[in-house]
UniProtKB/Swiss-Prot annotation:
GO terms for biological process: negative regulation of transcription by RNA polymerase II; positive regulation of transcription by RNA polymerase II. Residues 16-143 form the MSP domain. A motif (Nuclear export signal) lies at residues 205-208. It is a multi-pass membrane protein. Keywords: Endoplasmic reticulum, Golgi apparatus, Membrane, Transmembrane, Transmembrane helix. It is found in: Endoplasmic reticulum membrane; Golgi apparatus membrane. Plays a role in differentiation and/or proliferation of mesenchymal stem cells. Proposed to be involved in epithelial-to-mesenchymal transition (EMT). However, another study suggests that it is not required for EMT or stem cell self-renewal and acts during later stages of differentiation. It comes from Bos taurus (Bovine). This is Motile sperm domain-containing protein 1. The gene is MOSPD1. GO terms for cellular component: cytoplasm; endoplasmic reticulum membrane; Golgi membrane; nucleus; perinuclear region of cytoplasm. Gene3D superfamilies: Immunoglobulins.
Length: 213
């Protein structure tokens, strides 16, 4: 005897609701945008009842504000803005879609969609462009400030190794030359002319490097 497979009981308010888009933008100067379409998707194995609520229902007309969506199907919900006035520019309204099983009254899930009326699409594009330029300038200043400490570190002066080599070369040039019998310096510290030329050459390179830093 086969037992009937029972569907697990769903917790109220935890069912994900799939709606697109999640934001509606109406433009006062473009009548084609005064009508928007919300698409409600039902990816589940059971039918869903839905209801559309609004924070300001007097400003909108919702076609099919309540209904049902078959399993693994979708449904378009048409929303019209009927109060296009300048006093509503920039005001954010909200729609809430509540879904439930056809056999139950409790809401299994909900999804909110924001709606905004703007004066013009061109003004919106201009504001977005100005915002993008401002963000770009801010980023440029950020990177410039980030690199300043590195520049100061590089130009902090000659390294200890450079100073040490310069001192060695100067000391070598001050030592007596081979054949200088009147010097009190031990003979093993006497340098040849070629050795002093090498020391002078290295000292010149070090001096140029110090001036460049």
């Amino acid at each position: 005897m086969h037992q009937q497979k029972r569907q697990p009981e769903l917790v109220e308010g935890n069912l994900p609701v799939f709606v697109f888009p999640t934001e509606l933008i109406f433009y006062a100067d473009d009548q084609s945008t005064h009508k928007q379409v919300l698409t409600l998707y039902n990816p589940y194995e059971f039918a869903l009842k839905f209801k559309v609520l609004c924070t300001t229902p007097n400003k909108y007309v919702v076609v099919d504000a309540a209904g049902a969506v078959k399993p693994q199907c979708c449904m378009d919900i048409v929303i019209r803005h009927r109060d296009v006035r300048s006093c509503h520019y920039g005001v954010i309204d909200k729609f809430r879609l509540q879904v439930s099983e056809q056999s139950q009254r409790k809401a299994l899930g909900r999804k909110e969609v924001v709606a905004t009326l703007l004066p013009s699409a061109k003004e919106q594009q201009k504001e977005e462009e100005e915002k993008r330029i401002k963000e770009h300038l801010t980023e440029s200043l950020f990177f410039e400030q980030s690199f300043q400490p590195e520049n100061r570190t590089v130009s902090s002066g000659p390294s200890l190794l450079t100073v040490f080599l310069a001192v060695v070369c100067i000391t070598a040039l001050m030592l007596p030359t081979l054949g200088d019998v009147e010097s009190l310096v031990p003979l093993y510290l006497h340098l040849s002319v070629n050795q002093k030329l090498v020391a002078a050459y290295i000292l010149g390179l070090i001096t140029m490097a110090i001036f460049r830093t």
